[in-house]
Amino acid sequence: MACALFIAHWPRKIKPRKDERQLVSNIDIVPTILFAAGIKPSASLPGINLLDEKAVAKRNTIFLSNFAHDMVSATEPEKSLWTRSCIHGKWKLVAWIENPPNVRPWAGGHRHKNPDTNLELFDLLADPHETKNLANAHPEVVRDLAARIDDWWKVD
């Protein structure tokens, strides 16, 4: 899983490194910039300071969501929600929302690789391009990650 969140150059402040196994998110950008500017962010602000190597190393779970990116329901984002996902360790579970209201399917009628199931499980170390759905082979992992997703954001 190789994805650059962002690239920063700050001599004597940021050590050069390439780390493809740490979980980072766009929610980490604001806390990192605030810490770099000497401002302590509010405790209620989500995300971690990416300059704090211990905090980054400690994180082993991250949640993701995909939306239609329209303004149909800016105050109710679940109305244009396509997926909720959880990465925990080497595993990534993608929970697709079937036929969300106000969202048209992509060309061809399907929005994801496997239209036969709403759940896709990937081993990101063995399959970084997410081509092999392992949900049927690892139902215990699916149950665990699905529960984590629902604890994070339950959708009716």
Question: What positions do the PLM features span?
Answer:
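Catalytic cores of eukaryotic secretory-pathway lumenal/extracellular enzymes that build
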Residues: C3-A4
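The feature captures the short pre-catalytic strand/loop hairpin that immediately precedes
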Residues: I7-P16
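C-terminal cap/loop subdomain of S1 sulfatases and analogous C-terminal strand-loop tails that border
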Residues: I14-K15, Q22, I27-V30, L34-E120, ...
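Second-shell loop/turn segments in exported
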Residues: R17-D19, N133
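Intrinsically disordered, low-complexity polar regions and short flexible loop motifs
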Residues: D127
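Bilobed periplasmic-binding protein-like "clamshell/Venus-flytrap" ligand-binding domains
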Residues: I149-D156
